């Protein structure tokens, strides 16, 4: 058994880390279906400001969400350097525009620190904790909380 496999059977989990601006975030790897390069999206009328539009993903219409804008940060200006994380959010599949994918992490539950009390209610609603790894601070995000039910329908 590999060290990673042993770690996972001992309460560990695998996460995908990615950059948005100067910050790093991570999500459960099981929510990620694929990572692909930036594809220009077709804008949709009346969509929330953080929804860039839709793309055709092998015959399926995939909404593309500017993850930075969704978190209340400065909206991204997509370039060929950006990537789309195709992720499952409850019963929907969405594309998350991020700057770059940085790592696949294997962590134990004790590596995850609680979200600081200084975080806003919005941040606490989606942030499940903070990881301090190799001098980096990485926010663990719960995607189901980033997209409440009524907003998932809009996306």
From Swiss-Prot:
Keyword terms: Chemotaxis, Cytoplasm
Domain called CheW-like: residue spans: 12-152
Main localization, broad class: cytoplasm
Superkingdom of source: Bacteria
Keyword field contains Disulfide bond: no
Keyword check for tRNA processing: no
Cross-referenced InterPro entries: CheW, CheW-like_dom_sf, CheW-lke_dom
CDD domains: CheW
Location within or outside the cell: Cytoplasm
Biological processes, Gene Ontology terms: chemotaxis; signal transduction
Entry-linked SMART domains: CheW (SM00260)
GO cellular component term, pick one: cytosol
SUPFAM superfamilies registered for this protein in UniProt: CheW-like (SSF50341)
PANTHER family tied to this protein: CHEMOTAXIS PROTEIN CHEW (PTHR22617:SF23), CHEMOTAXIS SENSOR HISTIDINE KINASE-RELATED (PTHR22617)
Function: Involved in the transmission of sensory signals from the chemoreceptors to the flagellar motors.
Protein name from the UniProt record: Chemotaxis protein CheW
Organism of derivation: Rhizobium meliloti (strain 1021) (Ensifer meliloti)
